[in-house]
């Protein structure tokens, strides 16, 4: 029987173990037993907390999105200008918590399996919409709404593409280079546009 008060800790350990296990294998073809072993708990306890693999996988993805949203909100609160807001959005998407090798591999796996899972597809769409709307909010203070939408679409595609590129490579993810690439793209797209920022 699990100890009282241990559930949040055990759930987090299992979610972290799921990220590592999925990332190491590059597939959702993992078992609750494998995830539980990685977490150092029994499969029965994992089933007790999550009720099965599908719910554990969804909880893992929700956790990643929650962390991303929390970090993004904190970073945006520190931004005083549209340019600072854009920089904060890009930096958070390539933060150490998100742009780590196993987490990148887990994200790529989620994208692949979105073709078979409506729940995963829905969560990825939520992520994409939030990224897009956050970028547009800042960009439309610097250019037209139509152009802001196009730039945000391109920046989102670059972020996803950099995750895919790093997931397929053996090198340690280089967040600084990734951030610079996306920032350069946005700067080039905005060049020559009348700025609303003083």
Swiss-Prot record:
Transmembrane segments: none annotated. One of its GO terms (biological process) is glycine betaine biosynthetic process from choline. Residues 31-50 bind DNA. It holds the Pfam family TetR_N. Pathway: Amine and polyamine biosynthesis; betaine biosynthesis via choline pathway [regulation]. Signal peptide: none annotated. It comes from the Bacteria. The keyword Membrane does not apply. Keywords: DNA-binding, Repressor, Transcription, Transcription regulation. GO terms for molecular function: DNA-binding transcription factor activity; transcription cis-regulatory region binding. Residues 8-68 form the HTH tetR-type domain. Repressor involved in the biosynthesis of the osmoprotectant glycine betaine. It represses transcription of the choline transporter BetT and the genes of BetAB involved in the synthesis of glycine betaine. PANTHER family: HTH-TYPE TRANSCRIPTIONAL REGULATOR BETI, HTH-TYPE TRANSCRIPTIONAL REGULATOR RUTR. This is HTH-type transcriptional regulator BetI. It comes from Brucella suis (strain ATCC 23445 / NCTC 10510).
């Amino acid at each position: 029987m699990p100890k009282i008060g241990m559930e949040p800790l055990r759930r987090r350990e299992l979610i972290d173990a799921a990220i590592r296990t999925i990332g190491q294998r590059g597939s959702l073809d993992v078992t609750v037993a494998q995830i539980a072993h990685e977490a150092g708990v029994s499969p029965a306890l994992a089933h007790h907390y999550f009720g099965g693999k599908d719910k554990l996988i969804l909880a893992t993805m929700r956790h990643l999105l929650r962390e991303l949203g929390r970090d993004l909100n904190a970073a945006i609160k520190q931004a005083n200008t549209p340019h600072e807001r854009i920089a904060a959005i890009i930096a958070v998407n390539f933060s150490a918590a998100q742009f780590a090798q196993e987490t990148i591999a887990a994200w790529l796996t989620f994208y692949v399996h979105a073709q078979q899972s409506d729940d995963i597809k829905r969560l990825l769409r939520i992520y994409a919409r939030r990224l897009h709307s956050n970028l547009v909010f800042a960009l439309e203070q610097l250019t037209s709404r139509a152009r802001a939408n196009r730039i945000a679409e391109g920046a989102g595609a670059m972020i996803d593409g950099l995750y895919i590129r790093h997931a397929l490579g053996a090198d340690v993810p280089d967040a600084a280079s990734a951030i610079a690439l996306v920032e350069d793209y946005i700067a080039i797209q905005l060049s020559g546009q009348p700025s609303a920022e003083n």
